[in-house]
A protein has these predicted regions:
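Sec-dependent N-terminal signal peptides
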Residues: 4-13
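Boundary at the C-terminal end of the N-terminal hydrophobic targeting segment
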Residues: 17-21
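Extracytoplasmic beta-rich repeat domains
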Residues: 22-23, 30-33, 45, 51-64, ...
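Beta-propeller domains
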Residues: 74-84
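Short loop/turn segments that connect beta-strands within beta-propeller blades
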Residues: 83-87, 122-125, 166-169, 206-210, ...
Length: 371
């Protein structure tokens, strides 16, 4: 009986982690809890800038979208809600820089900030609902696991802990101690939370109990987050090396050293059926065979790539610090389309059916679509 209960619970955790976004919403950083950045919908054939709005302040945050509303933060500490036709609905002032994407869970928008506080506000009014305090800044996005009638919001902090709180009350459920800062967002798939940190360890945690099941010693800062697919975690480190790790067997399947030009990996891979795509501070977007790490193609831009790409079955969408938004062919890396935003972009795209949204570092939200 215990075996069958475990199988059912694993199914619930897996289904919940994959059901966080549909074609018309992007409620989490990277769209889904696995952080894989894959969408089923098509990108516009010839994207047009539909509108843009200057929101004040600079930002490294990325947008999320639910029910016709776009949410993001900025360095002034503002959490901003904008309708998908470009109207500001409300602002919540936290008083501390919001460096990562917020997340939407139910009727709440949940985000961390540089004062080390995880906050939940009402997504309609922006009213504060609860707050949870860690002992240092929160630089990454929160994520959520759901199992039956249980759920938890997980976020890493520079206090060396991964924290899990009740989404309704903000009360602590558990926390896991590491040996250095946690800069990225934890990924969730198949009943596992997987995250890295500046201690150079990739860690696997049980979401229900907070028990740390496995650690894989990478030996170099992991400044970003893994993307998960099946039993595999794909990620890069601060030295520019890219990895595929089997989190079930704790084996490194392949690793690709960084280029001679140097450059850290600050973004998260986008994981397709047979390939992964990842950008680097060396100005290249790389595409590798996901099974063996063979380089399939690379595309050079004119600036660092700090954000994370999004892909579908045929195309790759990404941004660069050169101020451009790009769409490439997934099969060959050839450029299909680009747009010059005129200012650096370090955030990652949010994609909904027929549209995508980009946030520039000078605080402009750009909406693209077919017409």
């Amino acid at each position: 009986m215990r075996y069958y209960f475990s199988i059912i619970l694993l199914f619930l955790l897996n289904s919940a982690s994959q059901a966080q976004s549909g074609n018309n919403e992007w409620p989490l950083f990277r769209g889904k809890a696995d952080l894989a950045g894959k969408v089923e919908s098509e990108f516009p054939l010839s994207p047009k800038l539909l509108w843009s709005i200057k929101t004040g302040g600079t930002t490294k945050s990325s947008p999320v979208i639910t029910d016709g509303t776009v949410f993001f933060g900025n360095d002034k500490g503002s959490l901003i809600a904008i309708s998908t036709d470009g109207k500001i609905l409300w602002k919540y002032e936290s008083g501390a820089s919001i460096d990562a994407a917020p997340m939407v869970y139910g009727k709440k928008v949940i985000f961390g900030s540089s004062d080390g506080i995880l906050r939940a506000v009402d997504r309609t009014s922006g009213k504060l609902l609860w707050s949870y305090t860690t002992d240092n800044q929160i630089a990454g996005s929160a994520n959520v696991w759901v199992a039956g009638n249980k759920a938890g919001i997980v976020a890493g902090s520079y206090d060396y802990f991964l924290h899990c709180v009740d989404p309704e009350t903000g009360r602590s459920l558990w926390k896991v101690e590491t040996e250095n800062y946690i800069n990225g967002t934890p990924a969730i798939l198949n009943g596992k939370i997987v995250f890295g940190g500046c201690d150079g360890m990739l860690r696997v945690v049980d979401p229900l109990t907070g028990k740390q099941n496995d650690t894989i010693d990478i030996g170099v800062y992991i400044a970003s987050s893994p993307a998960l697919a099946h039993d595999f975690a794909y990620f890069g480190d601060y030295d520019g090396t890219k990895y595929c790790v089997n989190i079930r067997t704790r084996k490194i399947i392949w690793k690709i050293p960084g280029s001679d030009e140097g450059g850290s990996i600050l973004g998260i891979p986008a994981v397709g059926n047979n390939s992964i795509v990842i950008g680097s501070e060396d100005k290249y977007l790389y595409c590798y065979n996901s099974s063996d790490g063979k380089l399939l193609w690379k595309y050079r831009t004119n600036g660092r790539i700090d954000g994370s790409a999004v892909l579908n079955s045929t195309k790759v969408l990404f941004t660069g610090m050169d101020g451009y938004v790009y769409i490439l062919g997934l099969a060959d890396g050839n450029k299909i389309w680009s747009f010059n935003a005129g200012t650096p972009i370090s955030s990652s795209p949010a994609v909904i059916d027929g549209r995508f949204y980009i946030l520039t570092q000078d605080g402009r939200l750009l909406a693209f679509g077919s017409n």
